[in-house]
């Protein structure tokens, strides 16, 4: 992918990159080592003077990831030249990890890019736990990723929980920490990191409630921990008290 801009005043290339093309300072530094900048077709450094009428181009091509592309179902809810919104199924990682390089959403997305002739990267703007399903936003290049991260507002989830929250609507303000230094699990603890989640009960039936949840901070397992702390664990959550024998899995869905 390429960004292009025609200068309308005397300035330096760095000013065009930051103000006109809105590249982050981190991306500007990264791209300058890739010979990504040209002015009137000639390679240029960020301190080069730029005059009115000069054409600035930025190549955003990135090295192909070292994990494999895979074919498989991919539910694309929205796509344009900069981003996609994908409906991630339950039980799938968003991105490969050290111990798992296949079977993730990113593997399937690479396969989709190959089939559609797109030389794009995989930059998750939002990440969901393996057992959380719903909407994942992914940028196609580092520039779009930075812009989407900066513009991202509150995320909204729906969750089926055991019990009826009291009050039915409110704010959970409870710090979250590791259960122990070596544990991957979290808990509410006074010495934890600040964590806030808004909740609203949408419906209650037979001792099960449907909640709308908005995490206002971004702690690991935040919604799962907060719901359990509220006394209403998410159904199907085996780690925080909501496991159901033979049930449909963790009932937490990202909706927007």
Q: What is the predicted function of each stretch?
A:
Residues 1-256:
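RNA pseudouridine synthases
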